[in-house]
Amino acid sequence: MSHRLLKTTRRPLAAALFVALIAPGVAFADTAKEKALEARIAELERQVQMLVNTSQQQQTQISQAQTDVTAVKTVQAQQPVAAQVPAGKQPIQVTTITPGAAPGTTVKIGGFIKADFLATQTSDGQLADDATGRALYLPGQTPVAGAGGSGKRSDVDYNAHAKFSRFNLGIDNVSDAGNKAGAFFEMDFFGNSLGNQTATNTYGVTLRHAYMYWNNWLAGQTWSNFMDAASLPEAADFVGPTDGVLFVRQAQIRYTQGGFSVALENPETTLLTGTRNPITGAWTNVASNSDRGALPDLTLRYGWKGDWGTFGVGAVVRQLKVDNQATGADADKIGGGLTLGGKWVMGSTDTLHYQISGGEGIARYVGLGVTADTAYDVARDELNPTGVLAGYVGWRHAFTPKLRTNLIYARSDYDNDGSLGPLVTKSVQSIRGNIFYTPMPKVDIGAEYMYGVREIEDGRKGDINRLQFTTKYSF
């Protein structure tokens, strides 16, 4: 009994001793886990704080960037809106090339290199060596027997030159207020008097255009406002329909509003004075110019344009004047004329070019000066303006986008004063056909045949045949 009691008593004691022995270990283990857990929590809290700090910095940077963008947009909104530039027309520079130019100034360089190869034959005599008519068609220079011609057919004369190559420079500016200003300059190498064909074929630079503009105003040298350059058909020749075309460049002041333009242009009077030898009966005509005009030539033009083409009407009123104190010549007259013409787009492959002009005292404007504006009658000391009727028509047909042809007819007739006699030009006319091939953009290769006739007052005629090849690279 006592033994069983002792045994029973020992079991709780053993259990108590066991608990007492392992309790510190258990407590120690719990404390270590808690510390490790606390350390991990602390590390997590540190990382969270770092993320919070980083997020705050990024938010600050984003806010600053948004502020900067807003400021830039505000500045851009205050600047003038730049004009939309068509594809392929982007400027080569962003900043101004010319240091002295106003901000926003653009510079454009252009022109072409043109080489011409001509074979010419005339029926009634030779064109003089280095004559202008050897390089381009001048209908007034076509020889006629008794009027600058021998009456004998010439041999074929061959000429080659590159003097019609040209270079131009355009400068344009639009101010913050929207005002437009700029200038244009163009030259070629048609200075015949400064060169020859002996060794280097050096020719002088000649001025074609030199003008400035400001909004609706233009001042300087360019095409006459009386002329419609846009209606000219394509030709290998320098002009093409020379016989019947208005073709003048001169200094002027011009105002343009929409399709209307008015200009005051440089005056110049061309004269012919006829004399008859009382013994032989032979007539001679002496050409001269007079820049004694007191009034500028007044020109007006109105034009329309659309998908159908272009059409315009023009007028000129001018003073014809001679004033030479040495000879005692002192006379003046009023001359004037009208013109209309344009370009009719007949379809995707065909275009019709046309012009008709008429008046008295406007011969200087027609055909590169086929004859004079007026006759000067020495005996009466008076001017008798020359009447003129001129025109041309040209048809253009495109076989393909790279191959095209032109057929052109031009003519002008003159009503001359009787004091000039029978040797003055009565009419000129020509017909030409050409073909052009464009193997790649800006490159043109062409061939052209031309036949022209000049008739004088007594009915005699002389003709000219010309075959011309041309190459051109535009830039």
List each language-model region with its residue ranges.
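Sequence/structural signature of outer-membrane beta-barrel proteins
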Residues: 120, 190-195, 224-228, 233-239, ...
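Gram-negative bacterial Sec-dependent N-terminal signal peptides
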Residues: 2-28
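N-terminal periplasmic/intermembrane-space "pro-region" immediately following the signal or transit peptide
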Residues: 28-128
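Detector for outer-membrane/organellar transmembrane beta-barrel domains
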Residues: 306-425
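Solvent-exposed, glycine/polar-rich loop segments of beta-barrel outer-membrane systems
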Residues: 125-146, 282, 325-329, 367-376
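Outer membrane beta-barrel
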Residues: 95-135, 139-273, 292-305, 310, ...
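Outer-membrane beta-barrel "beta-signal"
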Residues: 437, 463-475
